[in-house]
From Swiss-Prot:
May be involved in the regulation of fimbrial expression. Residues 59-173 form the Response regulatory domain. The keyword Iron does not apply. Keywords: DNA-binding, Fimbrium biogenesis, Phosphoprotein, Transcription, Transcription regulation, Two-component regulatory system. SUPFAM superfamilies: CheY-like. The modification 4-aspartylphosphate is found at D110. SMART domains: REC. It comes from Klebsiella pneumoniae. The lineage of its organism: Bacteria, Pseudomonadati, Pseudomonadota, Gammaproteobacteria, Enterobacterales. One of its GO terms (molecular function) is phosphorelay response regulator activity. This is Protein MrkE.
Length: 269
């Protein structure tokens, strides 16, 4: 596979290390694709790292203004994962500019960086339609609560042990794979291009993902709508609001909202 830096012998030895079986590799030409079939009852041995031979890699960026720290993290990612580092930055605004035109799956983020600190940067990123995983790696422990509120994947304090990073990389890879599998399942149901609904607050129209709506409550000729972060008062009764939500839910991508609309809508008398 072009650009793949994993040598065939290295792959062979790592599989042998994991499963205790030798595999014969011979007469391979450049570009040959190989697949390893491991019996279902095989159990990996030791602490080896399984090699996943797939065409898609997890795309990540590093945001760190200390050069040596940036290089160390880059080495750990390249050594202990199959992730592809598509950019390294030392300035928060540069990251926002990059993300306007590029999609990434995860961001390794320091907090004390120029122009826009890591917490503010994460708050901006949390508003994106595509929300990458965010892993804070910082010397500032006092921002852990904010990181939790932003639903960060992890919060790692400097100085860290290599094992801490390796463990995080493995968990992050698993979470990304599960996310992709879930997305593939939803795609087969032919989802709508935009799963959003317009809500009103302070005379402004707020375009909101229906996945953020978890509760709607009827009150006379108004409907109170609650999302994960805030609440809205819609100038319509609930029988007008619910069909809009159900029409979107009918696409197949919004089973959660369909359940909410059918079961969790309260009428106040």
């Amino acid at each position: 596979m072009p650009g793949n830096k994993i040598g065939l012998l290295n792959v062979h030895h790592r599989v042998k290390l994991l499963y205790g079986e030798g595999l014969h590799i011979r007469n391979l030409t450049p570009g040959t694709e190989i697949a390893f079939y491991v019996p279902n009852n095989s159990t990996p041995q030791g602490d080896g790292v399984a090699v996943v031979m797939s065409g898609e890699k997890m795309k990540v960026i590093i945001v760190e203004d200390e050069f040596l720290a940036q290089q160390e993290l880059s080495w750990l990612i390249n050594t202990h994962s199959q992730m592809e580092i598509v950019g390294s930055f030392d300035d928060g605004l540069d990251v926002l500019k990059f993300l306007q035109h590029n999609k990434v799956d995860a961001i390794f983020l320091d907090i004390n960086i120029p122009s826009l600190d890591g917490v503010l940067l994460a708050q901006n990123i949390s508003q994106f339609a595509h929300k990458p995983f965010i892993v804070f790696i910082t010397a500032w422990k006092e921002h852990a609560v904010e990181a939790f509120e932003l639903e960060a994947f992890d919060y790692i304090l400097k100085p860290y042990q290599e094992s801490r990073i390796i463990n995080m990389l493995q968990k992050l890879t698993t979470a990304w794979e599960q996310q992709n599998n879930a997305a593939s399942g939803l795609a087969s149901a032919a989802p709508r291009e935009n799963d959003t609904i317009n809500l009103i607050k302070d005379e402004r129209i707020i375009v909101t993902s229906i996945h953020d709506i978890y509760y709607a409550e009827a009150h006379e000729k108004m409907t109170f709508v609650y999302t994960r972060r805030e609440s809205f008062v819609m100038p319509m009764n609930i029988t007008e609001f619910v069909p809009d939500a159900l029409n979107i839910a009918a696409s197949g991508q919004s089973k959660f909202l369909l359940t909410v609309a059918q079961v969790s809508i309260a009428n106040r008398f």
